[in-house]
Regions:
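Non-catalytic, structured segments within soluble enzyme domains
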Residues: 1-79, 113, 169, 196, ...
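Short active-site loop at a secondary-structure junction
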Residues: 65, 92-96, 120-140, 152-158, ...
């Protein structure tokens, strides 16, 4: 009030009269408070500070900050985390999960859950935690291979190998002989991922990770093919965005605009930074392959009944579990684990709790877009057993102990889901592998978010690797 008087916004008479009046606190609807998206609000505050805004003035109501948050999807994420963690016996304080969603088209951050309970832990598992992604890193390896000319229909040896002193093994020690590359990703074969990184080189894989926006240091080691190196959920989800939009890396952002208390716009988000890093063909091939992960592979629990692609990831002794996936309009990454890095029970894998959380979030987040199709050239995935390969990756004169190819059996075995949460269509699981990519005429739906109003911020974001 004094500042308003000194700056001549009000007269002496108005100033004296206002001093005599009692202060009445404005009732702010709960929707506009930070308790519904506290981790996101912390992130926004940090972004505002980078832009040069004063924290005190923001927290005291000096500015109105309009954000990109999709509150309906955020609410679904908050509820999905609690429901699925408790449903799978992960109700302890150390048991945690994080969810991050953004638009691969314009970069808007839609969901930001850095943990299950902000009042007990303000540690942000979206931007601060560095946790190994397990097999959900394999698409980075496969993308590097696609960029080098390897095809989803090329054959690859799914049998044990040794690279130097490293001898990766498949989950359950199950091997299938010669299989198509797309099948290797669908069943999450560890040895096939190892063969691919050996084929294209560690440097190519690291370079692919870098151009896709993964900034966390990566070790120059073959084991990164199985996700042994930690990453941040924010940057990892950003990397998956390039598979969704034709190979473009889009920088996620949270702040649409900032207004003064008098309605003057003092900041407006600039045009989203977009760089083209993967070929359209590679993005189309990766999407076709990762669709099979959800329809026929290790990620069946994530099936939302509309075009979507993704990858499961589970690390050593089930310490970390991921599900990374996307539709044409939204990319979502989910991590589940313990803050103290201790072992979770064996049923907690990428295809269980993370996939179920992802499904719950995406069913809500994708509502405005219906069954949007990927706008990609058609990619034909030749049915298993019908491939006449141009080459076999990892082929040698020595024959594997089992000459005959086994029937496809998931190496990242999907544990039996509790009956209360098991919703997977049995017929969908038995579907033969076929082309999973829509016809070329399909188009990406890009209609704007029809969700609740943007949220103003009143204050103030290798053993058994699968």
């Amino acid at each position: 009030l004094t500042r308003m008087y000194k700056m001549r916004y009000i007269t002496t008479e108005e100033y004296e009269k206002a001093k005599e009046e009692k202060v009445h606190l404005a009732k702010v609807p709960q929707f506009y408070t930070t308790n519904k998206a506290p981790y996101f609000c912390d992130y926004v505050m940090k972004e505002l500070e980078k832009l040069g805004f004063d924290e005190t003035e923001i927290s005291q109501g000096g500015y109105k900050v309009v954000t990109t948050l999709d509150y309906k999807a955020q609410k679904a994420a908050n509820e999905a985390i609690l429901r699925n963690l408790r449903g799978w016996g992960l109700g302890g304080e150390k048991n945690q999960a994080a969810v991050f969603s953004f638009s691969p088209i314009d970069g808007k951050i839609l969901v930001y859950s850095g943990g299950k309970d902000y009042t007990k832990s303000q540690y942000d598992r979206v931007t601060q935690a560095v946790r190994p992604p397990g097999s959900s890193f394999k698409p980075i390896v496969y993308a590097a291979a696609m960029e080098k000319g390897i095809s989803p229909n090329d054959m690859i040896e799914d049998r044990p190998l040794t690279i130097g002193q490293w001898s990766p093994r498949n989950y359950g020690n199950k091997y299938r002989g010669k299989i198509p590359v797309y099948t290797a990703l669908m069943v999450s074969s560890n040895v096939c991922a190892a063969r691919l990184i050996k084929e294209v080189g560690i440097r190519s894989v690291i370079q692919t990770a870098r151009v896709l926006g993964i900034e966390t240091p990566l070790e120059y080691d073959y084991t990164i093919a199985l996700g042994s190196n930690g990453v941040k959920l924010f940057e990892f989800t950003r990397a998956y965005g390039a598979f969704a939009n034709g190979g473009y890396v889009v920088q996620p952002y949270a702040i649409e605009r900032v207004e003064t208390s008098r309605g003057k716009v003092v900041y407006k988000a600039p045009k989203t930074k977009i760089t083209h890093q993967l070929s359209m063909n590679t993005a189309a091939e990766m999407t076709a392959m990762m669709k099979t992960v959800i329809t026929n592979g290790t990620g069946r629990a994530a099936n939302i009944g509309k075009p979507a692609a993704g990858k499961t990831g589970t690390t050593d002794d089930n310490k970390d579990a991921y599900f990374m996936g996307y539709t044409p309009n939204i990319v979502t990454g989910v991590w589940v684990g313990n803050d103290d890095n201790t072992v979770m029970n064996k049923s907690i894998q990428g295809g269980t709790v993370p996939a179920l959380i992802w499904k719950d979030v995406m069913k809500v987040a994708t509502e405005p877009y219906g069954k949007a199709e990927f706008n990609y050239p058609q990619v034909e995935l030749v049915p298993f057993g019908s491939v006449n390969p141009n080459k076999v990756i990892g082929d040698t004169a020595a024959k594997p102990k089992q000459e005959e190819q086994e029937e496809i059996d998931l190496n990242e075995t999907e544990p039996v889901l509790p009956e209360s949460v098991r919703k997977i269509d049995q017929q969908q699981q038995q579907k033969p592998i076929q082309n999973q990519t829509p016809k070329p005429a399909a188009a990406v739906t890009t209609k704007p978010q029809t969700t609740a109003a943007p949220v103003p911020i009143p204050m103030a974001v290798p053993e058994g690797v699968r």
